[in-house]
Amino acid sequence: MSADAKHYDVIRKPLITEKTTMASENGAVVFEVAIDSNKPQIKEAVEAVFGVKVKAVNTTITKGKVKRFRGQLGTRKDVKKAYVTLEEGNTIDVSTGL
């Protein structure tokens, strides 16, 4: 399966934190994805871009914080995270290129 431009619109960037590093030991990778994407789109995009088989996709939406800048109230953007569990024997190394 080749990666189309639409697949790159779904996956924004990989998230590398202490929690995601621990999840990667269990075969899961965490990505920030487009807020309007759904689980089948995320699964298709990861399989096309990275050439792996996806077992499951779990998503969360984190609401943006209210912040103050020069006395004005503003809101940060909402962020959608996708926890992608890979099939046995498949790996994605997101730390390359850092």
Curated annotation (Swiss-Prot):
Signal sequence interval, chain numbering: none
A Pfam family recorded for this sequence: Ribosomal_L23
Gene3D superfamilies found in the cross-reference section: 3.30.70.330
GO cellular component terms, A-Z: ribonucleoprotein complex; ribosome
GO molecular function: rRNA binding; structural constituent of ribosome
Entry-linked InterPro entries: Nucleotide-bd_a/b_plait_sf, Ribosomal_uL23-like, Ribosomal_uL23/eL15/eS24_sf
Keywords: Ribonucleoprotein, Ribosomal protein, RNA-binding, rRNA-binding
UniProt keyword RNA-binding present: yes
GO biological process, one term: translation
Role of this protein: One of the early assembly proteins it binds 23S rRNA. One of the proteins that surrounds the polypeptide exit tunnel on the outside of the ribosome. Forms the main docking site for trigger factor binding to the ribosome.
Record-stated family: Belongs to the universal ribosomal protein uL23 family.
HAMAP family: Ribosomal_uL23_B
Assembly mode: Part of the 50S ribosomal subunit. Contacts protein L29, and trigger factor when it is bound to the ribosome.
Annotated protein name in UniProt: Large ribosomal subunit protein uL23
Organism in which the protein naturally occurs: Jannaschia sp. (strain CCS1)
